[in-house]
Amino acid sequence: SVSLEQTLGFRIKVTNVLDVVTEGRLYSFNSSNNTLTIQTTKKNQSPQNFKVIKCTFIKHLEVIGDKPSFNSFKKQQIKPSYVNVERVEKLLKESVIASKKKELLRGKGVSAEGQFIFDQIFKTIGDTKWVAKDIIILDDVKVQPPYKVEDIKVLHEGSNQSITLIQRIVERSWEQLEQDDGRKGG
Amino acid sequence: MTTTSTTSVDGRTSSTLKATLSASGPNSNGPTPAVLPQKPKLTGWAQAAAKALPRQQQQQQQARKDDSVAVQPANTKTKTIASTAPPANIKGSSTANGSSTNKKFKRANKQPYNREEVRSYMHKLFQSYTAGEKSHSMKTYKQVLSETASGRVSTATDWGTVSSSKNKNKKYGCLSDIAKVLRNQ
Amino acid sequence: MKGNFRKRDSSTNSRKGGNSDSNYTNGGVPNQNNSSMFYENPEITRNFDDRQDYLLANSIGSDVTVTVTSGVKYTGLLVSCNLESTNGIDVVLRFPRVADSGVSDSVDDLAKTLGETLLIHGEDVAELELKNIDLSLDEKWENSKAQETTPARTNIEKERVNGESNEVTKFRTDVDISGSGREIKERKLEKWTPEEGAEHFDINKGKALEDDSASWDQFAVNEKKFGVKSTFDEHLYTTKINKDDPNYSKRLQEAERIAKEIESQGTSGNIHIAEDRGIIIDDSGLDEEDLYSGVDRRGDELLAALKSNSKPNSNKGNRYVPPTLRQQPHHMDPAIISSSNSNKNENAVSTDTSTPAAAGAPEGKPPQKTSKNKKSLSSKEAQIEELKKFSEKFKVPYDIPKDMLEVLKRSSSTLKSNSSLPPKPISKTPSAKTVSPTTQISAGKSESRRSGSNISQGQSSTGHTTRSSTSLRRRNHGSFFGAKNPHTNDAKRVLFGKSFNMFIKSKEAHDEKKKGDDASENMEPFFIEKPYFTAPTWLNTIEESYKTFFPDEDTAIQEAQTRFQQRQLNSMGNAVPGMNPAMGMNMGGMMGFPMGGPSASPNPMMNGFAAGSMGMYMPFQPQPMFYHPSMPQMMPVMGSNGAEEGGGNISPHVPAGFMAAGPGAPMGAFGYPGGIPFQGMMGSGPSGMPANGSAMHSHGHSRNYHQTSHHGHHNSSTSGHK
Amino acid sequence: MAIKSLESFLFERGLVGSYAIEALNNCTLDIDVNHYVSRLLTNKREQYLDAIGGFPTSLKMYLESDLKIFKDFNITPIFVFNGGLTYNQLEASGHFTAASASASISSTTTSSSGTNATTRSNTESVLLQRSRGWTQWNNLISSNQNSYIDQPIQPQEPFRHNTTIDSKAYQNDLIAYFIEHGYMYQVAPYSSWFQLAYLLNSAYIDAIYGPTDCLMLDCVDRFILGMEFPNKEFRFIDRSRVMKDLGCTHEEFIDIAMAVGNDLQPTTLPPLQIYPVPQLFDIALEMVLNTGTNFYAYQLSTTLQNDSKENIQNYQRGISALRYMPVLKDTGKVELFVQEIVVSEEDSEKNNKDGKKSNLSSPSSASSSASPATTVTKNASEKLTYEKSSTKEVRKPRDIPNDVHDFIGQMLPHEYYFYRSIGLVTGKLFDAIVTGVYPEEPPLGGGSSTSYKKLVSKSVEIFKNKEINLLTQPINRYYQIKQIKQVKWYAANEPTTLTNRMSPSMFETINHLIVKTETSDEKEFSISEFITTINGSSNMAKDFISEKVIFPNSVPIESKLNSPFNLLSTNFLRLLVLLEFFTFDFKEKLLEPTRWGEVFLKLNELNIDSKYHESVIIFLVFLKCDVLKLDEEVQPPAPSALSQATLRSYPEESLYVLLITRVLTLFQVDQKPSNYHGPIDKKTLIFRDHLSFIKENLNELFEAVLISSLTSGEFNRLSLDNFGWARKIVRYLPFKLDSPNTIMAMMWEFFLQKYLHNGNAKNDALSLVATEFNTYKSTPNLDEQFVESHRFLLEISKVMQELNAAKLIDENVFKLFTKAVEFTTTALSS
């Protein structure tokens, strides 16, 4: 039998039970949690992509190409090195804050179309937010599900300017959605 | 008494040393016009010093060098003057001293992976989430599943891959193709 | 070496120690190997776990996608994961959303139920996709921190140095410098050695050139360029000096003198020194794979450079001479005879510093006495000289970035002249006595040909002989050697003792030349050629690789095809003398046999090998087939069919040679009268599919000839009755 | 290696002619030793050789009888050995990985290793069979554990099967034999059969006896394939007749040869690798004739397959090696043997280009080779004659590409090839310099013991670095920079880089040491004479340290080393300095023996028989390396050949037996040639591996020292012709011959065991040895051999005493050994 270490660096093609195929280099095989980690980007690329796959989820694993010449821990070009825990903590905090901001722009439990309409409006008008499942623009205009042109409501009187703009945006967005749909169908 | 001389230390005149230091900018790694002409000189000097030594002495030193295990590796190439950091700094505290040490190390060797520290941090982090589930409006996937329609239909987590395929009961079953290649090399 | 071994030992020990210290358990999974494929020890497990932990720790705070076992994909911010879980990885996502609803539900349905934070247990995590993970964050972070703190430190250092300026004459140890006030363990300096692998090369990536020049590393350069660690350079960084040595000051003076000498050299015209002083070699020729594996493609260039350098060249000045062979006259003559223009008593004096003029002077001139006037150099100077010479001669053509050209104006011109190799002589043999190999070979050939005609063949073979199972043992009468019988010749033996001996042979050649020379007094003494004259490459006549002598795929296939057709043509003509060769081709195309799949008949050739694993070549046994008189009558019809199909001698659709099915051997048998059973062969392509050939069926009295063109463009059939 | 399966094919087709041996009367016959040895040692012979080590004695027997017949017919044989290997051959033999892949394959079972008999290389098969032999043996031992008391078990599974014996291993022994009996020999720079072809073409010889590979050369019209001495016949092959019968052109034949596997391209390429070996050629020929297959095109068309790149590469290298093979020419230079090609004059330029682009060997196939048909149709023949009349044919040598070193190997100086050609060097070091790899392959005993591995790693410092420096210093400076690594079979991925460069160089440190005595040219070198010379000096430093170096050309011949004795003595002294048997300091004018050297210098005083001197040095160096004490068990322990009963009842005596057998691995029993089949002992074999390793390394270090001396010009190289070099120098080189086999050690082992169990009855014990070892045939004078080997033990015992006095060995070991020898004395004199 061969040392497990030697599996490192192999270019492999993994088909999971859902027949989704992942290709890349074997980065790690962990028997302690029964997973396989694949590096899916090219060696010299940065940043890198990885995929951790649970072994029980693998239907089939196939080697592509030859045995790598560098199949040992020592020769990997990614080797664990010092991790500054503070830095990790800091990064985590920053990204949580950033994500929170983004999160506000996502409707909870809304349809994909609704989100698309929101995004399109947000592109043009920065002051757009979700209130429950309604889109509120400039605290003036409301778009309710299912977010068609008919669903645009004015909250306060006398803001016709913005309403026409929003109508046009919503209209165009739906056209685009239908086009995309048609393309999908074909 | 044995004196250790390196390329980074020029002991002939203090003025030279000063020049070197003042010349090196805020980032001592950056080259400045004043540094470059200095460099061959040092190289040449050390080269000559090496030659001036009798051969046997060199060999002895070589031997001694091999026997000794250095407390810390030092990168003699850097222009910064080595300040010896207490071992605690290896753990990566953010004091000025510590970071300068790290910096010095950056070129020579990446610092070794701090396994225990990473593990304990990750452990704490995970604890903080799992212990305070409610505070983050935390839901587990199981809960999510039970709330959806499909959840009521029991979902098998085991896809039967292990029991059905030829890799049954084999710990490294999915790696069989790799094993084949390795054996045929 | 010893040190290395010891180091390795200690490192393994410490690793073992580290292992026992760590309280990390394997999560209850027994670490034993159930299958015979792989084995894994705690060491390996730990290494793998470290790899994954390292990756996961670096993925905290990035967006990830989790595929759960039902196929639904969730994306979100990875805020935590459990490294201790034993069945998959427990993952905590912040702001989860459904990216792909998989098979079953609609997104809306699933999304409704999600909260702000989602914990997915390892057993449900089928896949965890980590995207855009930057593993160099720590390094970058350290750098940015360091930059903030450096100025302050530098000032402190400056002050301290000023305070200690009275110690001018002393060398300062590390302890002195770091301040005697602090208590610090003394430590020894260690040479920085690159790790195995590519790290130390990768570090320079993505940085500006200026950064590199400061941190230029001699070891890295040498190792990168030649795969050699220079022993000399190691002293540069590791020398310790013993101040108490009585000869210390004397040596110091000596050292400074030498140092000055070296410094005064400058970089002009010497790419080596230029490189060593921080001028960068362009790395673009090396891709990461090369750096990674440590294989330097420039090895070839190096070889080429050496090749050109080792070629004796009278224009060259000081040649590099191995230290072993110093104090000897060296000669630039490519001939095996080394010649010198100095007399014997002068040889002792002449050193390898003799001027190019002296070395390259033509034979007729009186010897120049330059070398006598020169003082012999001290050994140290000689050594430096040696090194200088070595580095001067040792040039490797590199690509130089444009902005470097200014700096290297002079050296680049030297490079140019170096990279073009001098034309090479086809034969090095200087001797007039030896016959050129060409004539020898042809002479040998014609001789053996003549003798060949006298041999009575043991067996006359016409066309194809069928294979006989018993070997024919028939003795030949007459002579094995033909007309010219060998006779023992003692001279031959003597000749054998003297030939194949480079010393004797080159001496003979030398003496021969001497005889021919009238002014024999001026003749140089004979010396045996020094072994370092031989380059590591063989003499070539053209500047091309052997690989260029091979055809590409199409040409190779076409060649084989032509050959095959030619053979068929010949065998047809041979077998049916009255027939038109054009018919032969069509017949060749027609004489196929119906063939089922590989399972058609038990196959004698299979011998238990898996069928179809490669292109199987399948012989098979057809039913005995008989020759009918009616066949020739059918010929014209078939011929016209062939013509309709555009089949002249050569079909326009020529399949790959080895894919074609053709009769070859059966055609030979076709010429015999009466019914002769014969064996047919059928080829199959690499795919294991039977080749597309023509088929022939027979039903009682009626015959159908069914011909298919190779590509199935056109089918036609005719039937005839007896 | 020959073209796979071709020979049997030719016999079946009746294409092998035969002649009576008289036909060769008075001729000079060149013999390819590789081919010849493979004929003599067929599969059934010497099946247990790998379990006991040593030289195959039966080879000598066959050789002698053949030589006698040559003499009867006044045939002058010239034996040509194979030299270096080309890249394809190196790869196939596992050179670059020190056969580690093969070694690991041999440890797994055949079925799972994924190779079949067709694709497996010879090295793989050898190791596979060896491990099979030992596995079977272990099973046999354990199953007989209870019944075995003092009757040794005979092995059943052969240790060699269906593999060709590597004649390289016995090259030195054969050369020694040829020199002794006055036969001519030569070692080719690369392929031996090319050297034969060159010699034939330049009319130095009349006929060649070589492998079927010779058919690939169109300059060889006929060659002898085999000799059948019982019938006084020989078998030969006539090229034109074969080609006519096969019905393919010369180019197609070469294509087939490359695909089935031959000496220059040993692997069988797809699609042929799935067929059994005996049918390969037959099938390949059918494919060419019936479907117009071109195997090169086939390789190109299957680029998707895993190995296709390597296959294309191997094919190209094979063809190229055939076109440009270095041979040693009569000028003493090694040059490429380039065959000519025929081109028509007017198309010379064009055809040359076309020819270049062809993988087939000649562009004008119609004229250069037999056409497949005997008669040609009228039209076709007219066409041909028309073509012929319009053009003239020109023969010109092929163009030589600029990267011959990529498929042959880098070039060494002519002088180095010369030393190889006369057998002065084995060439393993040359190969290391050329390839950048010095392989440490698994020894006969497997080499799993830690002490052996330790020895391998220690050899880098003690031997290898010095050798590499000595050999790379005098030659092109590329080699001084080139990385040369020691690759070990057990850790092929962790090579040790050898140091080429030292300052001062190794040669500079020793070249002031000169032994120059006033002796005649004829004085023979021996270690004993050397000791006498050294001991004859009252002041070593004065007599053997020369103020001036003697290598420069300016030094007159008289002041150089002028006799073979002085040459060898000088270099032997240098060897001993490098081995630290002497300390030497030129500046201090110091030269004196170390404690080891003192023991060595006493060998004459102690009356040690001069024929054992070499063995004693090996023994001393082994002890000095200090990897295994003489009484120490190897780790992991190997099963003892003694029975459990013996080990349990006689623990003390068992230890004696261990010491005795170990020392006796240095003693070669005087055997009559025979195929050995008798008891085997792995434990002893493993110890023999250690000593054999030391010997090989001593040989290589001495070679390196000698070469550095010769190339620098310290010796008058013009004073000898080839026979002189052989008779006066090569013949007396120490450490050249293969180490003794383990037979004598085992004879003593089983003799003493029987003696112990049988109430100390010597005669029963001796007769047991006689029957078990079949000595009535192989060792008629068994008693004499026991007495002789006992004398050897006593002599070693004297050396041990000196070593003990000098505190160079453990006192316990010394006492134990003394007791052990006493034990043998009582047993033998009882």
Swiss-Prot record, chain B:
Residues in the signal sequence: none
Coiled-coil regions listed in the entry: none
GO cellular component: cytoplasm; cytoplasmic stress granule; nucleus; peroxisome
Stretches for region Disordered: 1-116, 147-168
Listed Polar residues bias regions: 73-83, 91-102, 147-166
Record field: compositional bias (Low complexity): 1-24, 46-62
The UniProt record lists the keyword Nucleus: yes
Domain of life: Eukaryota
Subcellular location: Cytoplasm; Nucleus
Entry keywords, A to Z: Cytoplasm, Nucleus
Other notes: Present with 1560 molecules/cell in log phase SD medium.
Oligomer and partners: Interacts with IGO1, LSM12 and PBP1.
Protein name per its UniProtKB record: Protein PBP4
Organism the protein comes from: Saccharomyces cerevisiae (strain ATCC 204508 / S288c)
Swiss-Prot record, chain C:
Residues recorded as bearing Phosphoserine in the entry: S106, S215, S436
Source organism, top-level taxon: Eukaryota
Xref: PROSITE patterns: SM
Other known facts: Present with 2870 molecules/cell in log phase SD medium.
Quaternary data: Interacts (via C-terminus) with MKT1 (via C-terminus). Interacts with FIR1, IGO1, LSM12, PBP4 and PAB1.
Amino acid composition bias (Low complexity), ranges on this chain: 307-316, 338-347, 356-370, 412-421, 456-471
Biased composition (Basic residues): 698-722
Sm domain sequence ranges: 51-107
Protein name per its UniProtKB record: PAB1-binding protein 1
Gene deletion effect: Abnormal mRNA processing; 3' termini are cleaved but transcripts lack full-length poly(A) tails. Decreases HO mRNA translation.
Keywords: Cytoplasm, Isopeptide bond, Mitochondrion, Nucleus, Phosphoprotein, Ubl conjugation
Any one GO MF annotation of this record: mRNA binding
Species annotation: Saccharomyces cerevisiae (strain ATCC 204508 / S288c) (Baker's yeast)
Family the UniProt entry places it in: Belongs to the ataxin-2 family.
Biased composition (Polar residues): 11-38, 429-455
Location relative to the cell: Cytoplasm; Nucleus; Mitochondrion
GO cellular component: cytoplasm; cytoplasmic stress granule; cytosol; mitochondrion; nucleus; ribosome
Function: Involved in pre-mRNA polyadenylation. May act to repress the ability of PAB1 to negatively regulate polyadenylation. Negative regulator of poly(A) nuclease (PAN) activity. Promotes mating-type switching in mother cells by positively regulating HO mRNA translation. Localizes MKT1 to polysomes.
UniProtKB/Swiss-Prot annotation, chain D:
Residue(s) carrying Phosphoserine: S358, S362, S371
Chain intervals for the UniProt region annotation (Interaction with PBP1): 130-380
Biased composition (Low complexity): 361-373
Subcellular localization: Cytoplasm, Cytosol
Pfam families, per the entry: MKT1_C, MKT1_N, XPG_N
TM spans (from-to): none
Outcome of substituting K453R: In strain: ATCC 24657 / D273-10B, ATCC 200060 / W303, Sigma 1278B, YJM 1129, YJM 270, YJM 627 and YJM 789
The protein's assembly and partners: Interacts (via C-terminus) with PBP1 (via C-terminus).
Function: Involved in 3'-UTR mediated RNA regulation. Binds to RNA-binding and RNA regulatory proteins. Complexes with PAB1-binding protein to promote mRNA interactions with poly(A)-binding protein. Promotes mating-type switching in mother cells by positively regulating HO expression.
Family to which the UniProt record says this protein belongs: Belongs to the XPG/RAD2 endonuclease family.
Descriptive protein name: Post-transcriptional regulator MKT1
Organism: Saccharomyces cerevisiae (strain ATCC 204508 / S288c)
